[in-house]
Amino acid sequence: MSMFGTATRDNATRVLLLGSGELGKEVAIECQRLGLEVIACDRYADAPAMQVAHRSHVFDMLDADALQQVIDLEKPHFVVPEIEAIATSKLVELEAQGLNVVPTANATRLTMNREGIRRLAAEELGLPTSAYQFADSYESFAAAVETIGLPCVCKPVMSSSGKGQSVIRTPEQIEAAWQYAQQGGRSGAGRVIVEGFVDFDYEITLLTVRAVDGVHFCAPIGHRQEDGDYRESWQPQVMSENAIKAAEYVAEQVVNALGGYGLFGVELFVKGDKVIFNEVSPRPHDTGMVTLISQELSEFALHVRAFTGLPIGQIVQYGPSASAAILGQGQSQNIQFNGLDDALSIPHTQVRLFGKPDIAGRRRLGVALSRGKTTQEATDRAIECAKAVKIHY
């Protein structure tokens, strides 16, 4: 049975968020609803989750000593990673001493780079994936491209939001793809994965919850990517019964192998009735922001329920829904928005502005949410809503 203390008191149940972006902000809000004490961490001040936390710390989470100091200071009951760029070896070490890492330190370690999770899925679990090879020099990279064949996809083993990813279609693009991957890796230049190009009908995120009362699945989420980053997502994605069963089988195998309690974003390619594993995040997923309007319990509420040991029960989905990213492009430390009156005059829409303190280039600053009679109608409304929000730099 879960027992929670009272936030700000000596008996508080403390949640330490490692990463304080828009997804962490929603996790923090759900923790606040249960009276949990929230400590938000990130590498920059005034990050979104810090704005709704009890207190915050700014430090480089890849610095194992700095991470240890914050954990020693705060003595959290739950450590909840929101991003991959964390000193995961330190979390593994501390978990062995009794630290509760969500879902597990090993899951965080394996999924922080594409090599760990790909080898788990393909080599240990025998799940269907694209053909792949890893490379850590230009020579081995060129050889991997030749072995895999063109077209193929090149990604840093550690990156997010499409950084460093490219599709190689001709031999002339090989060197540029290598250089781009080296610039886009989260921890600088390094190892890459070369993947065979998958011919798929569509791709989905299957939000999968591992909880005290078993494994649960949200309705599949379809999405559109551009430059490796999500632009729109919708739920439910129409799938054949066989494809849904195959997707749930793959997702359950992966989350059970990773272990622990929490929500996982399992990314899959679908071709007819066949499902191919792509990646998994052991935390809420950006495409899952649609659940803020599409479900009785959002992916963030499900994550908090699961890792605090509460039952999930039945996941209720309200019907065709969609989300569209509100993207900024510019330079500013004083971002302003207008057009919200126009955006919210569109039927069945909502807007979330993340409160990011600045922008230097392109950055996701908010999300538009909508419902409709069909997923197409919901998506069209979400896109229209997002476009109506005007950003001033």
From Swiss-Prot:
Nucleotide-binding keyword on record: yes
UniProt enzyme class: ligase
Protein family per UniProt: Belongs to the PurK/PurT family.
An example Gene Ontology biological process: 'de novo' IMP biosynthetic process
Residues reported to bind ATP: 114, 155, 160-165, 195-198, 203
Pfam families referenced in this protein's UniProt entry, alphabetically: ATP-grasp, PurT_C, RS_preATP-grasp-like
Catalysis: reaction(s): N(1)-(5-phospho-beta-D-ribosyl)glycinamide + formate + ATP = N(2)-formyl-N(1)-(5-phospho-beta-D-ribosyl)glycinamide + ADP + phosphate + H(+)
Protein known as: Formate-dependent phosphoribosylglycinamide formyltransferase
SUPFAM superfamilies: Glutathione synthetase ATP-binding domain-like, PreATP-grasp domain, Rudiment single hybrid motif
Superkingdom of origin organism: Bacteria
Assembly description: Homodimer.
Name of the encoding gene: purT
Entry GO terms, CC: cytosol
PANTHER family, sorted: FORMATE-DEPENDENT PHOSPHORIBOSYLGLYCINAMIDE FORMYLTRANSFERASE
Involved pathway(s): Purine metabolism; IMP biosynthesis via de novo pathway; N(2)-formyl-N(1)-(5-phospho-D-ribosyl)glycinamide from N(1)-(5-phospho-D-ribosyl)glycinamide (formate route): step 1/1
Molecular-function annotations in GO: ATP binding; magnesium ion binding; phosphoribosylglycinamide formyltransferase 2 activity; phosphoribosylglycinamide formyltransferase activity
Positions that bind Mg(2+): 267, 279
Organism whose genome encodes this protein: Vibrio cholerae serotype O1 (strain M66-2)
Disulfide feature: none
Organism placement in taxonomy: Bacteria, Pseudomonadati, Pseudomonadota, Gammaproteobacteria, Vibrionales
Limits of the ATP-grasp domain: 119-308
Keywords associated with the record: ATP-binding, Ligase, Magnesium, Metal-binding, Nucleotide-binding, Purine biosynthesis
